[in-house]
Amino acid sequence: ELIEDLFEVSKAANGTVVLHPEEVDVVSLLKQVRFELSDKIEASGIQFHFDLPNERLAASLDGQKTCRIFENLLVNITKYGMKGTRAYIKAEKDGEYVQVTLRNISAEELKISPEELTERFVRGDASRNTEGSGLGLAIARSFTEVQGGTMKIEVEGDLFRVILRWQLKDG
């Protein structure tokens, strides 16, 4: 898994990621990933609250890469979130953009800058005994940006928030 992750990050970094953009509904992708990860979510001890609109939020994205972004971010919450707390995942239209916000309470105070968190192999102190390559956020950021989107991380004490934005598809 580490080798595969490294391969993905380096491809994204040097612009050799092959994208298959098509019109995808971001809401449907989030629902699909939520379903695929339902066992992990259930076992995490964290209450996940999904606030998803009934309307489609279509963007021109690579469905597989975008699912990977959502997977990495949701799995991170199950791994590093504090048990007994809630995680909020919201998709919404914001002007000409589709915005997906994920926020949760970290099991440990995050004494690390948002920039450092997306560097390769950087993991918060608390994650030393958690499985993972340390590339989850780096891959999520790379796959977001290579598709013309932005991924912003905000850290405030133990509150962790990720905001993803992509241009909405006209129509």
Language-model segments: which ranges?
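Conserved micro-motifs of the catalytic ATP-binding
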Residues: 14-19, 58-61
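Short helix-loop "hinge" at the ATP-lid/N-box region of the Bergerat-fold HATPase_c
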Residues: 77-78
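Short beta-strand/loop element within the Bergerat-fold HATPase_c
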Residues: 84-96
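Short conserved segment of the HATPase_c
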Residues: 109-122
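Short alpha-helical Gxxx[C/S/T] motif in the catalytic ATP-binding
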Residues: 136, 140
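Conserved glycine-rich
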Residues: 148-149
